[in-house]
């Protein structure tokens, strides 16, 4: 649907979009969630995925890799993924439902990415994303984490948690 414009209602709901069309920008709106940009220079295919904790637990990142490889011919060995600014583990305090969802996806392999703090948990969504992408066949050197926390840098990025959900100007 290239050319629809940014503010047109979409005919679908999705946490990821991919393309093999040259010079076609892919856009999305994000707050604290892990936006991940994909590009394969070998096939000139691209994608963008929105990975909130539910999407991460549903496997949106490896599913995006799978669609790019199977439908667009992207090569896992040349595919690059960049995890953009998002809320970091230190600022992402959750109840038990989030780590439980991640454990259902990854089993015990998720434990290094979860810190228990009393009755709350701090979850490293970026670390989980990097692990899922390398498990999906991407080279570790082609998976880049921006390292930027949207909540800590709320003067530069909009953060749902930093603003307590308040939107607008």
Residue ranges and their predicted role:
Residues 1-169:
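Active-site microenvironment for binding and transforming phosphate-containing groups
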């Amino acid at each position: 649907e290239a050319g629809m414009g940014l503010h047109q209602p979409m005919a679908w709901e999705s946490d990821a979009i991919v393309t093999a069309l040259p010079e076609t920008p892919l856009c999305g709106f994000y707050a604290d969630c892990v936006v991940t940009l994909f590009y394969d220079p070998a096939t000139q295919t691209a994608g963008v995925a929105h990975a909130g904790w539910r999407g991460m637990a549903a496997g949106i990142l490896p599913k995006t890799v799978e669609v790019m490889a199977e439908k667009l011919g992207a090569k896992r060995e040349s595919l690059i993924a960049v995890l953009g600014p998002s809320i970091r583990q230190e600022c992402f305090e959750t109840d038990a439902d989030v780590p439980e969802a991640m454990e259902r996806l990854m089993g015990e392999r998720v434990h290094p990415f979860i810190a228990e703090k009393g009755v709350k948990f701090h979850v490293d969504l970026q670390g989980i994303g990097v692990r899922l992408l390398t498990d999906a066949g991407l080279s570790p050197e082609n998976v880049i984490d921006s390292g930027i926390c949207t909540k800590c840098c709320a003067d530069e990025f909009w953060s749902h948690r930093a603003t307590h959900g308040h939107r607008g100007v």
